């Protein structure tokens, strides 16, 4: 009996420390979740995009002054950071999309196309590494290929 109580206490403590891996159905991340997120980006609907994010979310853009890119923390700063994407590339589109999900993590691979405000055409392959909690994005880490002009 004593070992059963000890075992239960240890398991409860471990779940408290490391989190439970059990995901409730309404919080489950699916391929459809990622598909809807990309659709919101392609619709340039910032309200719809932000509905996928938790209040304490974090965004790491592919470019910026630090090795991890420009970093935004919190829902309002993340919204502002994402708005710069739509402002800088007004016709931005994510195509050739492939999504993967494992537990509370997702990967969305895509080809970004668009035209910058100064008329430069962009086509670049990239991906987002996404981490979810309770069905909402808590971390979006974006990567782009480095495209160099041919000589």
What are these regions (language model features)?
Residues 8-17:
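Bacterial N-terminal signal peptides
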Residues 93-95, 109, 122-128:
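Short, surface-exposed coil-to-beta transition loops
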Residues 88, 113-123:
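Short, cysteine-centered beta-strand-loop-beta hairpins and adjacent loop/turn segments enriched
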Residues 4, 17-51, 55, 151:
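Short, low-complexity N-terminal intrinsically disordered segments enriched in polar/charged residues
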Residues 125-148:
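Short beta-strand edge/turn micro-motifs at domain boundaries
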Residues 46, 51-101:
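A solvent-exposed, acidic/Ser-Thr-rich amphipathic alpha-helical stretch
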């Amino acid at each position: 009996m004593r070992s059963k109580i000890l075992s239960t206490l240890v398991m409860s403590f471990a779940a408290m420390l490391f989190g439970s891996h059990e995901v409730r159905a309404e919080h489950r991340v699916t391929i459809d979740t990622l598909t809807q997120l990309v659709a919101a980006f392609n619709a340039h609907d910032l309200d719809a995009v932000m509905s996928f994010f938790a209040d304490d979310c974090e965004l790491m853009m592919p470019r910026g002054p630090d090795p991890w890119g420009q970093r935004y923390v919190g829902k309002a700063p993340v919204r502002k950071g994402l708005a710069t994407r739509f402002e800088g590339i007004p016709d931005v589109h994510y195509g050739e999309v492939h999504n993967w999900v494992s537990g509370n993590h997702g990967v969305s691979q895509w080809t970004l196309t668009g035209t910058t405000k100064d008329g430069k055409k962009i086509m670049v392959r990239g991906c987002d590494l996404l981490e979810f909690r309770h069905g909402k994005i808590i971390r979006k880490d974006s990567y782009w290929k480095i495209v160099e002009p041919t000589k």
